[in-house]
């Protein structure tokens, strides 16, 4: 039995709402997700609600061992499209009919949130009753109140349309966000496991998760998170240090993981890291923006316990121009040299298959990677990860098609020409499947359902690979995330001509969201 610290135990007989927060991936991934902690803490702050966690491959709660069918609401966090398969398995194994039209008033209300639900929930509409589009704290209180108000929520789904941010299939919805991050949920008593088993240890180890900002100002044309979670908001330094101090006191943890789409863009990142170090805390972060890394920041992170920095050059300069990635080769090399100087390891992320990429670009990429690897002062100090580019909804590249044959050829070329061991490329077939799930519509429902009971041949998924033009009606047309479609079309055309657009990082960054949040 797994021992956890800070798990919340209530008597479910004394609450009005039993809520299952489900993570359709492994425990270590679930406990690395700040959003999963936020839902747990936020809902359990209500006396009338008991939120329990259910983590794949289990279909019973960690707190009381209750099957999913025993809950009033079953909620799934959709972080990755490949997790859709696990959602359906968890429903089946939890005693809930997989297809929503087969459920009765005796079954729970099934909802979903997270990035995939906010960008394109359409492939899952055969299985999920309602979706939360946006940031949960902005809507969950009103949602729970509505559930408790209705005698049978599943028979009255239209009643939820009064709540901004709740999506019911075939209805328009506008994404909701927390206006001021000081009003967001910042869990202090975060749950963490007491174990040495690597299968259960979160990605950041025994760390307190500290959210410094939401959103991004960089304007990369391939990045869904950077497009839909706008505008950028950040927490004041004083509040962050107080949260870290209180959280680490309540958990006993000695390391802080900084969380945000663009952590190193935080306006007081050096002061934050210095403050945490002065508290005697180690600091780690998932990745850093090359443009924001300074000698002083690396020195602070080094003395705070960081061993590896992760940066994303993405490709060579000619391709970066199409992607609107404002970093030069010189800045990448300079950053790596700074890291080596401070005896830090470096992990580099690249993509293949970005729009405008040519055979000549691939040849240049091999030479560029070789040049960067040679900057290391010792073996394996610089590691490499290469992923196929996958178009995403609500981005300028949503009209691009995924070319499996081309990706396979490029992956083979890199494998033959990059001579280092610490190098991996994501499987192109898996990337194709992710593309279909990310960009498809409700035509995927039947294959998803079949996948619960049998292995669906990859060819059948490939046959449903979309091919959108600028005039196509997109499946997510009813999902308003605040991005002007005409702006996206203009950006796509500029990308094909390798023209760059300044990001929004010159705008004032505050904790508040403007009333009109349509971008550009």
Language model segments and positions:
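A short beta-strand-loop structural module common to alpha/beta enzyme folds
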Residues: 48-58
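N-terminal [4Fe-4S]-dependent radical SAM core
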Residues: 1-20, 27-28, 169-209, 491-494
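Conserved SAM/AdoMet-binding glycine-rich loop
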Residues: 21-22, 82, 242-347, 351-381
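Radical SAM enzyme core and accessory elements
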Residues: 1-8, 19-21, 28, 417-520
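Flexible glycine/acidic-rich beta-alpha junction loops that bind and position SAM and/or redox cofactors
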Residues: 267, 296-297, 320-324, 352-360, ...
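Canonical Radical SAM [4Fe-4S] cluster-binding loop centered on the CxxxCxxC motif
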Residues: 33, 201-238, 515
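Short secondary-structure boundary/capping segments
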Residues: 36-38, 126-128, 147, 227, ...
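Glycine-rich beta-alpha loop elements in corrinoid/cobalamin-binding modules
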Residues: 56-173, 396-441, 450-455
């Amino acid at each position: 039995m797994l021992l956890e610290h800070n798990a919340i135990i209530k008597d479910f007989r004394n609450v009005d709402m039993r809520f299952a927060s489900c993570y359709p991936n492994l425990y270590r991934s679930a406990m690395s997700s700040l959003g999963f902690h936020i839902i747990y803490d936020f809902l359990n702050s209500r006396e009338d609600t008991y939120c329990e966690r259910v983590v794949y491959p289990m279909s019973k709660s960690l707190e009381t061992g209750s099957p999913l069918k025993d809950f009033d609401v079953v909620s799934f966090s959709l972080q990755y499209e490949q997790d859709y398969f696990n959602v359906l398995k968890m429903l089946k194994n939890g005693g809930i009919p997989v297809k929503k039209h087969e459920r009765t008033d005796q079954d729970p209300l099934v909802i979903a949130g997270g990035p995939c639900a906010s960008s394109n929930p359409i492939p899952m509409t055969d299985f999920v009753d309602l979706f939360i589009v946006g940031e949960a704290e902005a809507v969950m209180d009103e949602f729970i109140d509505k559930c408790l108000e209705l005698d049978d929520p599943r028979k009255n789904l239209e009643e939820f349309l009064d709540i901004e941010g709740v999506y019911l299939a075939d209805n328009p919805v506008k994404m909701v966000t927390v206006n001021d991050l000081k009003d967001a949920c910042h869990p202090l008593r975060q749950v963490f496991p007491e174990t040495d088993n690597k299968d259960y240890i979160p990605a950041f180890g025994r760390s307190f998760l500290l959210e410094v900002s939401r959103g991004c100002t960089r304007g990369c044309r391939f990045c869904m998170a950077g497009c839909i979670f706008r505008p950028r908001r950040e927490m004041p330094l004083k509040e962050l240090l107080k949260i870290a101090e209180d959280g680490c006191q309540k958990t006993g943890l000695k390391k802080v993981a900084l969380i945000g789409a663009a952590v190193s863009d935080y306006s007081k990142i050096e002061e934050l890291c210095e403050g945490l170090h002065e508290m005697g805390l180690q600091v780690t972060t998932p990745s850093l923006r090359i443009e924001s890394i300074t000698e002083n920041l690396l020195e602070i992170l080094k003395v705070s316990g960081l061993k590896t920095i992760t940066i994303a050059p993405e490709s060579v300069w000619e391709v970066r121009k199409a992607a609107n990635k404002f970093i030069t080769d010189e800045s990448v090399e300079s950053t790596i040299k700074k890291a080596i100087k401070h005896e830090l390891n470096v992990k580099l992320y690249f993509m293949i298959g970005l729009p405008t990429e040519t055979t000549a670009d691939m040849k240049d990429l091999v030479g560029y990677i070789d040049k960067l690897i040679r900057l290391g002062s010792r073996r394996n100090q610089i590691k490499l990860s290469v992923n196929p580019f996958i178009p995403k909804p609500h981005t300028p590249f949503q009209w691009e098609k995924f070319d499996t044959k081309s990706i396979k050829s490029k992956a083979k070329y890199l494998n033959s020409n990059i001579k280092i061991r610490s190098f991996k490329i994501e499987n192109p077939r898996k990337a194709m499947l992710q593309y279909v799930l990310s960009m498809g519509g409700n035509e995927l429902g039947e294959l998803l359902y079949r996948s619960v009971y049998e292995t669906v041949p990859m060819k059948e998924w490939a046959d449903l690979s979309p091919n959108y033009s600028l005039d196509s009606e997109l499946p997510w047309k009813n999902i308003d995330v605040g991005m002007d479609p005409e702006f996206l079309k203009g950006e796509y055309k500029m990308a094909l001509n390798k023209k760059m657009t300044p990001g929004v990082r010159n705008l004032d960054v505050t904790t508040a969201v403007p009333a009109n949040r349509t971008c550009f």
